[in-house]
Design a protein with these regions (language model features):
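Right-hand nucleic-acid polymerase module
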Residues: 1-141, 151-225
Length: 225
């Protein structure tokens, strides 16, 4: 349960199209507000980690060609990607450059996006992926990525990722619980050297969708996307 939830107004008790402007009677004023999780406290991160563990493990039962990967960024590639980051403007039209941990995550995001663009150019479609960022703890402390890539063209992973070193799981091995636990631990990992850093997840849509459909469809008439 979230440690620092925010209370927002319950739309059920506001005039809207669904109720045609007829607000239901309120028997208990406490229902006028609903708690929304902050998504940043340790309890929220633990829940997010557990949710992804289930989705990734169940997904690996249906799709067998997943590979555990690590992507790194060299100093040179970080400098180049930093120069290519977009410049944002604030309300006063002043240009703002990202810095600190926001810059690190933006560099990783741009690197992955360009990796996917190159992959689509070669294979005519994107590659299924789930990646999470982490900061190094020795030497340069450069940002890097751990995660999963689903493909039968694992030899192209290293060829297309040209920002630094890559490590790809051996072809004969499958995704298992220990691998999933390893990559999802970064969601709620306590990083004492970078206490303010929040990792980001970069992933394809629909991971775990087959599990959700098989689990929920017997109980409802809706489909999941």
């Amino acid at each position: 349960m979230c440690l620092y939830p925010t209370l927002i107004k319950n739309k059920k008790y506001q005039a809207n199209k669904k109720n045609g402007g007829n607000i239901p009677a309120v028997s208990d004023k406490r229902v006028l507000y609903v708690p929304v999780a902050c998504g940043k406290c340790m309890e929220c991160k633990k829940k997010k980690s557990r949710d992804w563990q289930v989705r990734l493990l169940e997904d690996s039962k249906h799709i067998k060609n997943g590979k555990f990967v690590t992507f790194t960024f060299s100093n040179e590639s970080i400098s180049k990607l930093h120069k290519d980051l977009p410049i944002y403007t604030n309300k006063n039209k002043r240009k703002l450059e990202l810095d600190g941990y926001d810059r690190d995550n933006a560099i990783a995001k741009l690197g992955v996006r360009r990796f996917l663009e190159k992959w689509r150019k070669k294979h005519k479609k994107s590659v299924r992926h789930w990646l999470i960022t982490e900061l190094g703890h020795e030497g340069t402390e450069n940002i890097h990525l751990h995660g999963l890539i689903w493909t039968d063209h694992e030899e192209d992973i290293d060829k297309i990722w040209d920002y630094g070193f890559t490590w790809v799981q051996e072809k004969e091995k499958n995704i298992n619980e220990s691998i999933v636990n390893y990559i999802t631990k970064y969601i709620n990992k306590v990083d004492f050297e970078h206490k303010e850093y929040n990792p980001i997840i970069l992933c394809s849509k629909g991971i775990g969708a087959k599990y959700l459909k098989s689990f929920f469809l017997p109980f409802c008439c809706y489909s999941f996307v």
